Amino acid sequence: MDDFKGRHFTGGVILWAVRWYCRYGISYRDLEEMLAERGIDVDHTTIYRWVQRYALEMEKRLRWFWRRGFDLSWRLDETYVKVRGRWAYLYRAVDKRGDTIDFYLSPTRSAKAAKRFLGKALRGLKDWEKPTKLNTDKAPSYGAAIAELKREGKLAPETEHRQVKYLNNVLEADHGKLKILIKPVRGFKSMPTAYATIKGFEAMRALRKGQARPWCLQPGIMGEVRLVERAFGIGPSALTETLTMLTQHFTNAA
């Protein structure tokens, strides 16, 4: 299936624009000018539609690659995001190293929202991949959510719930880096458009932290570029790319 069928631009150009927008914290108009400098004439409203269509798909396809190898000590917190002039709550989790675990956008801050967030973060994890320690602020919603997940068997009974403020410093710092990406938006139009865009931001943040490095066949940014392209079936397969790199290596060594 061609994900870019009917588009006026190639998949490579579209992913280039979406990846840049989600990675570098620039406005749609600035990105329009940057692409124009490279001979690509596209309106900023078209770039917006690309981000809405492909950012969440990019996060979905890359999720398997970056959601691996977490430390079992997690940090949970929420930050604020403006949607239609009102504050929404972006729940986020990282491990003690700062690697992104998961996120969830909610219009409310409640035990129900906290449970949905934690349930999403735990979904698909084997028992041995689930956290042994959860650090949160003192909001009672987290305690209620954790207790309910334990009763449902989704968290082990011995999972420790801590409320140590300084342990969340790594997550607070990560909030700040995400806010740099969100700032040019100047407020989202709706919850669906906000969530779609944030999914792209979070996916690019995870790649930038090196969470998918084992699956990047080339070093640096080009490894990430090719991983994104392969996720959409663009360019050579991983096997072909590996064989090409090996051939070049032995040719240069000869």
Model-based region annotation:
Residues 100-101, 131:
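Short, solvent-exposed beta-strand edge segments and adjacent coil->beta transition regions
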Residues 8, 108, 112:
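Conserved phosphate-coordination/catalytic loops
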Residues 1-82, 116-254:
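Charged, often Cys/His-bearing segments associated with DNA-binding zinc-finger transcription factors
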Residues 84-100, 110, 118-122:
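Short conserved beta-strand segments at catalytic cores or DNA/RNA-binding microdomains
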